[in-house]
Amino acid sequence: PASKWGRASTSLPMLIAEELGVDISWRPILVGGIFNTVNPSVYAQRETPVPLKARYMKKDLADWTRSAGLSIKMPPTVFPVNSVKAMRGCAWLEPQGKLVAFATATFEAYWRDDQDISQVPVLTAICRTAGVDPDAFFAGIDQQPVKDQLKANTDEVMARGGFGSPTIFVDKTDMYFGNDRMP
């Protein structure tokens, strides 16, 4: 939920999957963990952006979100945001079949509504929007197996060559990076 490009890429795979009759296996990751481990240059680019590239990326994001029917407020008030609790929530909700509803509500709260998704009251409201019991959610995201699963997902995407978000695998091994790279 912390990646604007991740937000721009969520609706297209669902449409493609529906059209082709295939399933999507969503795997929550900690993009900050990936950046810290294999792609720390992201931080330097944030500190010293290339003005022409930054202007183009803003236009490109606006084009993608408009074509997907999404609204994104740029820049969000809190950026980067600590998305650990939200991503643990995605990991906890994945086996319950509620990951997509929760992730969608989280993306909208952060990118559309400019809310700080690291805050408990915001996550509580997101849970309610997604039909998730907030008390069970906060108990669930504190469980060690949930933390371990999120770390394992993050480690796995790096082991498979991933360096950011969105990273998409087709047929388990064919990797694509970026919302505009889907086959």
Regions found by a protein language model. Give the residues of each.
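Structural alpha/beta surface segment adjacent to cysteine/selenocysteine redox centers
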Residues: 8-113
